[in-house]
């Protein structure tokens, strides 16, 4: 996994996970995300670890009008980290 996204949101964790999986990961990013894993921090916070083959395209998808509207509707705030293997 080379990317970590920490998200806070107003919908439930299950709604967040379902929407992000079906609308974003399996639709918009299906060609650049090879695997992913959700970690529930609490009902309104998630850590998403994923392997992304093109971080530039990921950024473009996250800034798309559809993604921006979804974020606004669900009060979603993302912090994105690139992860590098240390040892």
Please give the residue ranges for each predicted region.
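Short S/T/G/P-rich N-terminal loop/turn motif that feeds into the first structured element of a domain
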Residues: 1-68, 78-87
